[in-house]
Amino acid sequence: MNQYLAVTSNGMENLLVEELTKLGIENAKPVQAGVKFKATNEQIYRCCLWSRLASRFVRVLSEFTCNDDMDLYLSTSSINWVNQFHSSKRFVVDFNGTNREIRNSQYGAMKVKDGIVDCFEKKGLPRPNISKERPDIRVHVRLHKDKAILGVDMVGSGLHQRGYRPESGRAPLRETLAAAIIMRCGWDGHQPLLDPMCGSGTLLIEAAMMAANMAPGVKRKQWCFESLEDFEPDTWAEIKSEANVQARRGVKKVDAKFFGFDNDPKVLKVAQENARRAGVEELIEFAQGDVATITRLSGFENGVIVSNPPYGERLGTEPGLIALYTAFGGQLKAEFGGCKASIFSSSDELLSCLRMRADKQFKLNNGALPCHQKNYSIAERSADEVKGADTNTQIAPDFSNRLKKNIGKIGKWARKEKLDCYRIYDADLPEYNVAIDVYGDQIVIQEYAAPKNIPEEKAKRRLTDIIRATIQVTGVEANKVVLKVREKQKGRSQYQKLGQVSETLEVNEYGVKLIVNLHDYLDTGLFLDHKITRRRLGEMAQGKDFLNLFAYTGSATVHAAVGGARSTTTVDMSNTYLNWAKDNMQLNGCIGRQHRFEQADCLQWLENAKGEYDLIFIDPPTFSNSKRMETSFDVQRDHIKLMTNLKRLLRAGGTIVFSNNKRHFKMDEEGLAELGLKAQNISSQTLPLDFSRNKHIHNCWLVTHAE
């Protein structure tokens, strides 16, 4: 007998022990991400062919203390490699791990290779060749701290490669993991099995192969143990022949029914082709279907639903996934009473959207991603009970009630004002710390970063509730909900690009048409707290020369132009936003040489600007480090210097509309008086109803000549 290590994923060790025991292995011992045991050649051949859970089997030749490269070389060269494989065989070293002295796995592999070839040379034999592309032998090394395991891989390519799925295909779930999910889902091998989001069909194919008692390795063409010196071809031929016969007979004896649905017809074709290659196509019925509308199938009494729904990690996918899981849970309860369900996901928050209590749960890894598998018993309920439960279940009641109240009040005001864009919630309740804005038929939820004393899991669960409640209260479709995370920004980082969706939306603000982008940037191109300021600028602009500094996307310029400004000058450092401003102007028919756009650092532009203007709007950042200037800008510290330059451009009888977002900003009225200017605080007049709870969102001033 030889010592072996069966390699598997974290969380599958005990399941693998059970499987190996059924295959005739005694005293199998679980270790981290593996199982150790002893076996004869016949037993290991059978394990390689029949294991659904192991990713590979390694014959352990040595376990040793490895402090440095010399320990590694000496331990390797002390093994009698001639007894393992012939010098004509090509080999490769798979080296996993590092320690304080062996810091590079390639270097570790080289030292092992040296030890092997030197062993052959010392016995007067030719050096075996290295081949990374098509090796006959794979030497396996696992190093952790000062402990090393060295052996030969019995398999070759991973055992998850059953041969029915092309490696080029999309495979979010490895076959070994799919088998573990099936083994733990509560299915007895005879009940009908349904995967309503089957994708490429891996879960159903693995289950069908189990029901048919089909060896998972029956389609494999090459095994590394066939190149070992102690290979027993007759024993292997007999084991393989038995498995082939069993595969043919087993398919005909299956009494379970398998159903796979997916809303993507292209993916379904892939699933059908995979099932054909696996030899179980006649057992599985694939059809196009949506998980949100799936109904109980004929003959599905006491069936099992198993699924691996999407659980995307990228910011912005959450609203759609929350709606998907919510709809899935609703359909399970409405249509599949008396059945069982087993759902696999990396997100406990998404699983909570099913609104079902799990009977059992298991922890497994999908690659490096920690995941949960939860098993549910679905209670039998009448249609009226299901409908009543759905109607009466309110998510996050305090938040939902506040949102309803705000929508009633603010929505009515927005319709009267002819506004497409407005805020319906602004962290009204401290525990639900988000801002929610309406943009036409879409909604943007901005999550303010949670305080450090709030546990991450609690913050995630609360955000999930917010999104679900917002969808429920507003009735908006999930694909029209956009999620952003807002943290304290420095300089112009709020303008940095987040993505590349490039999907824009045209909105209306007091009769002015504007373009917003809800996806690609932290901000959307329109600061909603300044809507009344912009309207006022439009009312003041008739027949005047208008200057807009720190113009962003030029929305204030558009209001001024639509209001009848004689000319407009729009200045911003970003060429992206200047082009956006041009598009906004063109959308409203405001084109011509009287409308100028200048890309420049506004502070430096002011130092050298010439000309006079009747109306100037300036909304500078609270603080800025300009690359083109030697010093920083602080609006509290530097606003008098700013006004000094602005006065030079302000025509007699003209007005500066000066705004900023610094809380508790204090205007230096004495400094203004010395310049011959005076200021009137109009902040309360420019605060719209939807921002009435946040009276310090901005401050706004009218600055004019004192005389």
Curated annotation (Swiss-Prot):
Residue ranges occupied by any THUMP domain in the UniProt entry: 43-154
Provide a Gene Ontology MF annotation, just one: 23S rRNA (guanine(2445)-N(2))-methyltransferase activity
Output the InterPro entries linked to this UniProt entry. 23SrRNA_methyltr_KL, DNA_methylase_N6_adenine_CS, RlmKL-like_Mtase, RlmKL-like_Mtase_CS, RlmL_1st, SAM-dep_methyl-trfase, SAM-dependent_MTases_sf, THUMP_dom
The record's listing under PROSITE patterns reads: THUMP, UPF0020
Q: Identify the keywords attached in UniProt to this record, alphabetized.
A: Cytoplasm, Methyltransferase, RNA-binding, rRNA processing, S-adenosyl-L-methionine, Transferase
* Subcellular location, principal: cytoplasm
Instruction: Determine the domain of life of the protein's source.
Output: Bacteria
Give the matching HAMAP family: 23SrRNA_methyltr_KL
What family name appears in the similarity comment? Belongs to the methyltransferase superfamily. RlmKL family.
General function of this protein = Specifically methylates the guanine in position 2445 (m2G2445) and the guanine in position 2069 (m7G2069) of 23S rRNA.
Q: What is this protein called?
A: Ribosomal RNA large subunit methyltransferase K/L
